[in-house]
Amino acid sequence: MEEKLNYWMIVAGGGGKVWSLFKEENIACIDFDSNLSSILDYKNPQELNQGKQRDKFIWKFAHDIKKDDYIIATTGVKEILGIGQCVKPYYFDESKKTFKHCIGVKWLKVDGGWEYQGKKGVRQTINWDRNKERINLYESILNGTYRKNIEKVVMNKNINDYLDI
């Protein structure tokens, strides 16, 4: 049986400040200003000791994003910057000063400018998106049929059904 691909929204730094890093290095990465080593060295999320919500974000990033899953890079709650597919599962890049927690990504669309409305009041670092209408929207971006005025309505609909992790 073929494994279902998932769609993960990952903020490219507040306001997209590390989007250029994502594109240049073909990665998506997260950083919580902590001294955590590789997440794979920990037995459970509680051992991370970064706070309950952060523990879940970091743990899911390292353990649940799988090869071929779709990665939607965003600015936070307003714009999709790019869409790609995971080509390398979680790894820890000790050579970086920040944003050491990484996954390899083949960026398929990097034009940006696709509007959406994220879930207000919730940290948007990582979300597993299960909304079929938004997934259809991501697919329209990938296949070149995205239409801003029509698709914007879809992105604003049912914004509360992200799976917050």
Question: Model features per residue range: what roles?
Answer:
Residues 27-32, 90-94, 103-104, 122-129:
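Short, low-complexity, polar/charged sequence segments that are solvent-exposed and flexible
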Residues 1-60, 161-164:
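Compositionally biased, charged N-terminal/linker segments
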Residues 15, 86, 106, 115, ...:
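Compositionally biased, intrinsically disordered low-complexity regions
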Residues 36-113:
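Structured alpha/beta reader/binder surfaces that contact nucleic acids or chromatin modification marks
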Residues 19-23, 95-96, 114-120:
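Short conserved micro-motifs at the rims of enzyme active sites and ligand-binding pockets
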Residues 20, 60-63, 88, 148, ...:
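Charged/polar, solvent-exposed surface patches and flexible loops
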Residues 3-6, 112, 116-165:
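ATP-dependent helicase/translocase motor core
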